[in-house]
Amino acid sequence: MIRISEIQLQLDGTEEDLKKQAASRLKIAPEKIRSLTLVKKSVDARKKDNVHFICTVDVDCPLERFPKDSKITQAEAYHYALPQGKPRALRPVVVGFGPAGLFAALILAQAGQRPVVFERGSAVENRQKQVAHFWKTGALNPACNVQFGEGGAGTFSDGKLNTGTKDSRARKVLEEFVGAGAPAEILYMAKPHIGTDRLPGAVKAIREQILSLGGEVHFDTAVQNILIKDENVTGVEVKPQDAAPYTVATDRLILAVGHSARDTFEMLYSLGIPMEQKPFSVGARIEHPQCMIDRAQYGKFAGHPNLGAADYKLAVHLENGRGVYTFCMCPGGSVVAAASEPGRLVTNGMSNFARNGENANAAILVGVEPQDFGDEHPLAGMYFQRRLESEAFRVGGENYFAPVQRVEDFLKRVPTKLLGDVKPTYLPGVTPCNLDDCLPDFVADSMRQGILLMNRKLNGFSYGDALLTAVETRSSSPVRVLRGENLQSLLAKGLFPCGEGAGYAGGIISAAVDGIKCAEQVILAP
């Protein structure tokens, strides 16, 4: 196969147009191309009067002479090589069933290791009902919510699959998702997403594959303790929601609990498991009319059916040394209640596959360093998050209504009394207020500077009626659970801290890749 990159395709261009351009680049007749596969497709909107796609394709054709063109290369077929290991006397245990745990369990199952999975939250079918109930009534289930349950926090985020990782295992993740029913376009879109409406079905299909290969998945079952003897993992104590605790023996434990498993972090600390503070970011969600973002990004081409809703990714560096950036941008989406602890309020963003909602939203975040925590305790960052979430809960009215403020009012430091053109999407409801009442001064001041600077990059970003919804604290884990080159804990042999919660990933793909890497080490370990 021959790979051709940087082919320009007009917005109304067809596969036949792509084929003709590929043939032209190869200096052959189009009919000589036996097959053409789209490998990557992205939008080039740098010139607003010429918005188009940039494509990479693989073609199969006879070629007498290879063109001297750096954009034409031999395509290397990807094939994931499953590690070969021996069956063990004790089955490996996976704790957590988000992206890291899901793919760790899948690889273990495909390798014949018959993993046993424990997830504190519910299966995705019941989880969706629990989350919908919380959004409607404000009645939180601390064990099953936007953070906990099958699929992890990413299930209610848009299913964004874009990643900075260059690890080839990312292709394995995408192929497994497509095999589980996700849209095939995630294999080639530059910014792939499955959508909150479609991701649950794909997650369920992967779970069913794990079960068919001899694995077990226990939902509504929390791990209360890790048993360690002579610096070796010997088992876990688990507590089903409606049954007595029991112990499971294992000498291989993948801990993939996500960034919000705060009781697990406290348990690890009590066991003396080495961990350290980690930088993260906090801020709020910002909502604009999606049509405004479309016009700012695509100009006269805004609304073109082949473009869909526009996104953005912005970052600025302030004179005070802080970084401010947008994160987890959700075109045509909603701001959602993402709390997992009573008395604490958290926001997140999500959108369905069609991305056809009226508003665009993204987190606008300020970098937070360990010196901001006010304590050297390894969990000080987690306690910092809790303080912000408690303040947001208080300011919102102590009923999971979120504090909101118009951008114009936020910039002027005056409370919002009435909302403007942008209608909030957050449920169960919102409370107009002054966000300075629930954000640290350095965060609020940095956000104000950031919004004005970002408006220079994206026209309309500082729109007065744009809406800020607080507080966003779960952009990444506040701790890193230390591990060695074999991916095992520095203290406990057989304990594999994994994924975003352990501080080694950020997002669905990188977490899933880390889950695969940990599973490989479990399989190959002596």
Feature-to-residue mapping (PLM):
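Residues forming the flavin
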Residues: 1-51, 58-156, 160-526
